[in-house]
Amino acid sequence: MIRRLSTFALAIGLSILGAASVSANPPARTASDKVALYAWLQVANGTAQDVIVEVEVNGVKDWGRPNQDGRVEFVLPTNEVALIHFHKPGHISKSVKVDTHNMQAGAFKGKRRSIDFGVVLEPASEQPGLVYAGPVASIGFDATAGEMTVETDTRLVPAARQQSIVF
């Protein structure tokens, strides 16, 4: 199922989720060429202690861990596309795509921006053998107004089977 949410609906939905951070210090207020990103993790049947968060921008990957409360904080460059992957043993991994192109469009030109969102990791035992078809959310900015847009896709598909090839 693919849906498009308004920024207001996203803010309401995300305001009820938890809190935590990849680095000990929160990111400083960013210049208009960067965007601060804050993700809150909620882990069903567990803690965020062994969650790994991987960020990929332009083929370069970096990773970190959330703080004790499940909060992840980092800064992304503008005019880039980032894939953020959330992994926890025994849970279904999720990815979020963040496109910072058009972030400075419209009334937002020259203003500091930030993105806040929540991620819930469910136990793999609830959906055995299934994975998400792709990023569960795609966050971007409207080209004319600069307003944030969000599309979600929570379709589950069978996991690719790893098979040994014998020669």
Task: Annotate each predicted stretch with a short phrase.
Residues M1-R4:
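Positively charged n-region of N-terminal signal peptides that target proteins for export
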Residues E73-A82, P89:
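Short Pro-Gly-centered beta-turn/loop motif in secreted/extracellular proteins
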Residues R113-F167:
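Compositionally biased low-complexity segments at domain edges in trafficked proteins
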Residues A20-A28:
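Boundary at the C-terminal end of the N-terminal hydrophobic targeting segment
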Residues V60-R71:
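Short, acidic Ser/Thr/Gly-rich low-complexity loop/linker segments typical of extracellular
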Residues H85-N102:
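A short, solvent-exposed loop/turn motif at the edges and junctions
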Residues A9-L17:
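Bacterial N-terminal signal peptides
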Residues P26, S32-V51:
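Structural motif
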